Design a protein with these regions (language model features):
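Flavin-dependent oxidoreductase catalytic cores
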Residues: 1-196
Length: 196
């Protein structure tokens, strides 16, 4: 079915349209796909007309953490590196890549053609501008806590970020510089308060 879906999409949109297919590279659940099956599907998806393969790591039901703080940075890039040797289209990797330096090392090591990030952009909406300006030390990093992003999403609450209180509230709160600045002290501040 996935191969047919990609084939039909390619027929519908023509050759000059990018089709990104998200493929679970490792399921991390009992009776999940084997690496051989993943590679075989990746090859068939490429033949069917996908332009890029995007990496999925594990299922939400998996008992293996994939994005938590305890997971080492770039921990699953070995999986995309293995698939890259089997297909000729670009392969995107993800999971626990939360600084420009980590992303660059993934690319330099040939573990992926591209890097996907999501939570780092919740943590700091200016991530790319700071990275491009060579000021990565000013980026408020995603700490992998998943408390205000995933936990809120799964409980039907507004997604946010513990290190960025503005995340997902950009249109609800108007942040304007004060006309009468004052010196204040924050007592009992957590890590999120100290990053700004």
């Amino acid at each position: 079915l996935p191969i047919e879906v990609v084939r039909r999409c390619r027929e519908a949109v023509g050759e000059d349209f990018i089709i990104i297919y998200r493929l679970s590279m490792i399921d991390l659940v009992p009776n999940g796909s084997t690496q051989e099956e993943v590679v075989q599907l990746a090859k068939e998806i490429e033949k069917a007309g996908a332009t890029i393969l995007n990496t999925g790591i594990g299922w939400h039901e998996a008992r293996v953490p994939t994005i938590a703080t305890s997971v080492p940075r770039r921990a699953f890039t070995w999986i995309t590196k293995r698939v890259m040797g089997e297909v000729s289209i670009p392969v995107i990797t993800s999971n626990r890549i939360n600084t420009p330096e980590v992303a660059e090392s993934v690319l330099a090591d040939g573990c992926a053609s591209m890097v996907s990030m999501a939570r780092p952009f919740l943590a700091d909406a200016e991530f790319m501008a700071k990275a491009e300006a060579g000021k990565s030390e000013l980026i408020a990093p995603c700490i992998g806590c998943n408390q205000a992003c995933l936990d809120h999403t799964f409980s039907g609450k507004l997604t946010s970020c513990l290190v960025n209180p503005r995340a997902c509230r950009e249109t609800l709160i108007s942040w304007q510089p004060t006309t009468s600045p004052r010196a204040i002290a924050v007592v009992g501040a957590g890590v999120a308060d100290c990053t700004r």
